[in-house]
Every structure is written in C-alpha cells, then in structure tokens.
Amino acid sequence: MAALDVTGGIATGKLGRDVGADEGQRGDRARMALLITGLALFFIVHLVPMRPSARAALIGGMGPGIYRGLFSLVSIAGLVLIVLGYGQMQGLGRGNPELWTPPVWIKHVVLLLMIPAMILLVAAYVPSRIRSAVGHPMLTALMIWAFAHLLANADLASLLLFGSFLVFAVVDRIAVIGRPSPGPLGSAKGGALQDMLAIAGGLGLYALILFWGHAKLTGVPLLP
C-alpha cells in the first residue's frame, strides 16, 4: 500500500509539472503573439504611405482628418503592444531563446554606431547640409539603430523587434529613392551652423540616452 501511495504521489507530481509546463508554453505563445500583433499593426499602417495611390485613395474616401486620426491610433496601439510584448518576453528562458552569443566587445561597436544614428535623427529636423546629403536621415538613423541593436541582442524577441524595424527601414528607404525628403523642412539646405547644430544636438541626445535615458526607458543601464 505504501508503494502504491509513493507511485501515486510520483504520478501526481509529474502530472502537475506537465500541466505547469503546458500553461507556461501557452503564456509564452501569448506574449509572442502580443509582440507580433503589435509589429503587424505598426508596420501595416506605415506601409500605406509607401504607395501614394493607396494613401490618396484612403484620404479621398475618409477625409484627411479621419485618416490622420486612424493612422495615429493604430500606430500608438501597435507601439503599446510592441512594448508590452517585448517587455514580457524578456527573461523567459526557453520561451525567448538566445539564438547566438554576442562577443563581449560588440557593446563598444554598438555604442559607436549609435553616435551617427543620433546625429542623423536630429538632422531630420534641422535644415542642414547633412540632411540634404543623406536625403532621408530619419530612415538612415532607424536602420543604424536597428542594426546596432541586432548586434547586441541575440534573443528571439529582439530578432523579431529590431529585425522588423531594419527590414522596414530598408524597404522604405528604397521606396522613397528619387522623392524629396518629406516633412516641413523639405529638401531645404543649410550651412555650417546648421550642421553644427545637428551634430551638437545629436551628441547631446546620445549623452542623455547613454547616461540616463536608456536605463529609465528599458531598465538596462548602458554604463556600469
């Protein structure tokens, strides 16, 4: 009888572990689905402007105000799901496996790559010669940012997140070849002062993120 009790206890324990494992796998899939849904929403709505005819048809059908409102709403919803899904997938172990092992020195490469990324990001809003030379500095900054973070993060969630942004930026950059740079600044050219403003602003933004912003936004400090 004692043997039966022991056997039954072992069977019950195994069943409990199996149920727990199944629930864990379902939770992992739900978190992954959250991230993928967010990425799909964000990029689908941002693919529409790549086809001017489709964008014009939507604006003509619903009006510019409703179009902008829906665009913003879907974009924000996608970003919220991306942040939630990516955040929940961190530290999941088997649910978010490491696909390779980044070398220790890659962190220094990433920190260097982010310097031009921040300068180009600021240059997108400054009518400088940098903006004119690059053409679409925002997309170029996005490409560098995504590529750099792919180098430093080897988990599945990071591959989905940063890989998706890299592919989107490359495709969008190809799609806008030959078009003037969008936005209120258009293709306006500036001089040395504007270049210096873009560089100084980019370096300032880089320092802010390096010493404070990244740790506050992601919980991961960049410096010891």
Which stretches of residues belong to each language-model region?
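Short, Lys/Arg-enriched N-terminal segments with co-localized hydrophobic residues
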Residues: 14-31
